[in-house]
Regions:
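Positively charged, low-complexity intrinsically disordered leader regions
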Residues: 1-44
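Conserved nucleotide- and phosphate/pyrophosphate-binding catalytic cores
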Residues: 208-415
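Short acidic, glycine/serine/threonine-rich loops at helix termini
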Residues: 87-91, 136-142, 230-234
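Active-site rim/loop-helix segments in enzyme catalytic domains that contact anionic ligands
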Residues: 66, 77-115
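Buried hydrophobic packing segments
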Residues: 61-65, 178, 201-209, 298, ...
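Short, hydrophobic/aliphatic alpha-helical segments
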Residues: 38-47, 75, 176-186, 227, ...
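Divalent-metal (Mg2+/Mn2+/Ca2+)-assisted nucleotide/phosphate chemistry catalytic cores
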Residues: 18, 98-221
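N-terminal catalytic cores of NTP/NDP-binding nucleotidyl/phosphoryl-transfer enzymes
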Residues: 27-89, 193-199, 205
């Protein structure tokens, strides 16, 4: 039987960093019953595998799952292999493109490989929601759909806005909140975690559990982590994500590129540093040193202490002593995708002319050529140590060359 901490201690621990608990008295009651019976709570968070590899934005919820796990409760890491085929419409102004089952399963495999970088295998259930949805018949879906109304669905801000703007809302999108809510019924969740943008879906889970004769789950929302741009939420589709499997130097360099203001938010959501200590650092620490400490902590969490030290040393050599890093990430880029015809730059000495905006996109620095053009105009790009402001540049055709965008560096080779 697990040994649980006093209820007040548990509440204080799980509330850290949260935005809203619906409802806190219910959570207290569930914790009291758990303490009295010795039965752990079932705490759920769902992740649709719409892209390969988890990123730091995902870990905000995963770290909160770990907090419940630290207290002795059972956590459920739910992979939405079925809901991923529907596509979460949250925050979308248009219907998401559908992914195939094969794509989703390939992505899901990477999630399964990475989940235990944060969670303990002993008290983690990894589940797939196709486990129950593939068994549902048409009549079951009609019964589920009867649990809500179109007018209730249109209360969602994104659906309401699209309806007002006369933009299409596909019928399958209306099923997404119901499907997510039904997950909670099937898992008998006591608590569900989600980002603030998921609040509507989480509340549907409460209503469905009640409709199916279960005690309603408590909803705990967490902040959305902004990506490297400091504006949009972290997402691979926005090109502003830091993957938890990225090489140590790449991860360290990306973290060093965030703004000083965003750094404190990362401290709060991605580390166990207490708020009192964060406030003291804001007053006393030099921002550069605080950012180095943040980057070192996060690289250590997902790699090792040795990798963290090495990444910091290589980054310092590169940016503070103007040396090339020993372990810059190497990427290959198809030559035909970036080269151009240019008598001025192309020559017979082993060099070739390339379009820099195309290279930045193909090498994974940016998500679009437009963003690449903006980086060039911002004087944020250097090739082999030389800042570049022209759209076309000459690079070695037969060997790798260093490209820097902000604090990120890669060794690029044309193939």
């Amino acid at each position: 039987m697990p040994k649980f901490a006093p209820v007040d201690e548990q509440l204080a621990y799980v509330k850290k960093g949260s935005v809203e608990i619906i409802r806190e008295p219910e959570l207290r009651s569930k914790l009291e019953k758990s303490l009295a019976s010795g039965t752990p709570l079932r705490v759920k968070a769902g992740f649709d595998p719409t892209a390969p590899d988890l990123h730091l934005g995902h870990t905000v919820l995963m770290r909160k799952l770990k907090h419940f796990q630290d207290l002795g409760h059972t956590v459920i890491f739910l992979i939405g292999d079925f809901t991923g085929m529907i596509g979460d419409p949250t925050g979308r102004s248009a219907t998401r493109p559908a992914l195939s089952a094969d794509e989703l399963m390939r992505n899901a495999k990477t999630y399964m490989e990475q989940v235990y970088k944060i969670l303990s295998p002993r008290t983690t259930e990894v589940r797939f929601n196709n486990e129950w949805f593939e068994k549902m018949k048409s009549a079951d879906w009609i019964k589920l759909a009867a649990k809500t109304t179109v007018s209730q669905m249109l209360e969602r801000e994104d659906f309401h806005k699209r309806f007002q703007d006369e933009k299409p809302i596909a019928l399958h999108e209306l099923l997404y909140p119901l499907a997510q809510g039904y997950d909670s019924v099937m898992l008998k969740a006591d608590v569900e975690l989600g980002g603030t943008d998921q609040k509507f879906n989480l509340l549907v889970g409460r209503e469905l559990q009640r409709a199916y004769g279960q005690e309603s789950q408590v909803v705990l929302t967490m902040p959305i982590l902004e990506g490297l741009d400091g504006v949009q939420k972290m997402s691979k589709s926005y090109g502003n994500a830091i993957g938890i499997k990225e090489p140590p130097l790449e991860m360290y360099g990306k973290l060093m590129s965030i703004s000083d203001e965003m750094m404190w938010r990362y401290y709060e959501l991605l580390t166990d540093v207490q708020m009192s200590e964060i406030e003291q650092m804001k007053r006393d620490a030099h921002p550069m040193q605080a950012k180095k400490d943040l980057a070192a902590r996060i690289v250590k969490d997902f790699h090792s202490a040795e990798a963290s030290v090495k990444a910091a040393e290589d980054w310092a050599k590169q940016f503070q002593k103007n040396e090339a890093p020993a372990a810059a990430e190497e990427v290959s880029v198809p030559a035909e995708a970036v080269t151009v015809e240019s008598q001025d730059l192309a020559s017979s000495n082993g060099s070739c002319a390339i379009r820099l905006d195309k290279l930045l996109k193909e090498a994974g620095f940016v998500s679009s050529r437009t963003e690449g053009e903006r980086k060039i105009k911002e004087v944020a790009v250097a090739v082999e140590g030389q800042t570049v402001t022209a759209p076309i540049v000459s690079v070695p055709a037969n060997k790798g060359f260093l490209v820097r965008v902000g604090k990120r560096v890669k060794r690029v080779r044309l193939v």
